[in-house]
């Protein structure tokens, strides 16, 4: 039975895991953290008063 011969299947399994563990995490991580969050200022900003034109 040829499917029990581990020679071709083991190398396919090995190369697929190499792709999953080496190449794909780098590509995925490049898309996750492309925007660095900006730090908020500790000073509170004074909000502008609302304009109520109907009163």
Swiss-Prot record:
GO cellular component labels: mitochondrial membrane; proton-transporting ATP synthase complex
Main location per the UniProt record: mitochondrion
Family matches, as Pfam families: ATP-synt_8
Keywords in alphabetical order: ATP synthesis, CF(0), Hydrogen ion transport, Ion transport, Membrane, Mitochondrion, Transmembrane, Transmembrane helix, Transport
Cellular compartment(s): Mitochondrion membrane
GO MF annotations, alphabetized: proton transmembrane transporter activity
TM ranges: 4-24
Membrane topology annotation: Single-pass membrane protein
Biological process according to GO: proton motive force-driven ATP synthesis
Transmembrane keyword on record: yes
Keyword Phosphoprotein: no
Similarity annotation: Belongs to the ATPase protein 8 family.
Known role: Subunit 8, of the mitochondrial membrane ATP synthase complex (F(1)F(0) ATP synthase or Complex V) that produces ATP from ADP in the presence of a proton gradient across the membrane which is generated by electron transport complexes of the respiratory chain. ATP synthase complex consist of a soluble F(1) head domain - the catalytic core - and a membrane F(1) domain - the membrane proton channel. These two domains are linked by a central stalk rotating inside the F(1) region and a stationary peripheral stalk.
Summary of subunit composition and partner proteins: Component of the ATP synthase complex composed at least of ATP5F1A/subunit alpha, ATP5F1B/subunit beta, ATP5MC1/subunit c (homooctomer), MT-ATP6/subunit a, MT-ATP8/subunit 8, ATP5ME/subunit e, ATP5MF/subunit f, ATP5MG/subunit g, ATP5MK/subunit k, ATP5MJ/subunit j, ATP5F1C/subunit gamma, ATP5F1D/subunit delta, ATP5F1E/subunit epsilon, ATP5PF/subunit F6, ATP5PB/subunit b, ATP5PD/subunit d, ATP5PO/subunit OSCP.
Name this protein carries in UniProt: ATP synthase F(0) complex subunit 8
